[in-house]
Amino acid sequence: MILSDGGIKSYLRRGLMKIEPFDENQVRENGVDLTIGHQYARFKNTEDVLDVTKEEDLSKYYELGFMDDEGIVIKPYEHVLLHTREYIEMPADLVGLVNLKSSFARLGLYIPPTVVDAGFKGEIVIEIIGSSFPVRVRPGVPFIHLVFLRTDSPVLRDYSVRGHYQGQRGIRLPKLPIKL
């Protein structure tokens, strides 16, 4: 079941879920709008092969930076990691589905399907893929819509048990090696 605005406000009011900083205007009919944070990571063009089963120096593959109020320009078809300004804490009985806000999608920007697991705590990191033309994004602008789905029962082992990105603030690059 998807939570309505009333259900979301009830979870927040009872302290079962947290969003910080939070503005009531972020709650929409069936989800919450989240805004762009200040840090970003650009994927570099390189011929170096990254082996996901080994520890790697990821600075060869990513350029990390911080946005000022002017933001950054996402180049055509470029892949960039952004994060939410908001830190969220998910309860054990909710899962989040992240969608790009329609206005950004209508500009040709795209994000892969993204799930926020039950028990996750942190800022959400999103890969955004550029349009056919350059697009400037700025911190503080609402860019994703988080929809909450209630599980049939609280999960037995939530994200805090084995999640690599628990507690993340800003951009946390992939954790390597990925275990087989």
Curated annotation (Swiss-Prot):
EC number from the UniProt entry: 3.5.4.13
Q: Which domain of life is it from?
A: Archaea
Which UniProt key words apply to this protein?
Answer: Hydrolase, Nucleotide metabolism, Nucleotide-binding
The answer to keyword Plastid applying to this record is: no
**Which pathway does the record list?**
Pyrimidine metabolism; dUMP biosynthesis; dUMP from dCTP (dUTP route): step 1/2
Task: Give the intrachain disulfide bonds.
Answer: none
Give the reactions, separated by semicolons, that this protein catalyses. Answer: dCTP + H2O + H(+) = dUTP + NH4(+)
List the molecular function annotations (GO) for this entry: dCTP deaminase activity; nucleotide binding
- Listed binding positions for dCTP are 101-106, 117, 159, 168
Keyword flag Transmembrane: no
According to its UniProt entry, the protein's GO biological process terms are: dUMP biosynthetic process; dUTP biosynthetic process
**Residues in the active site?**
127 (proton donor/acceptor)
What would be one Pfam family of this protein?
DCD
The job of this chain, per UniProt, is described as: Catalyzes the deamination of dCTP to dUTP.
The record's subunit annotation is: Homotrimer.
PANTHER family found in the cross-reference section: DCTP DEAMINASE
The UniProt entry's sequence similarity note says: Belongs to the dCTP deaminase family.
Q: What is this protein called?
A: dCTP deaminase
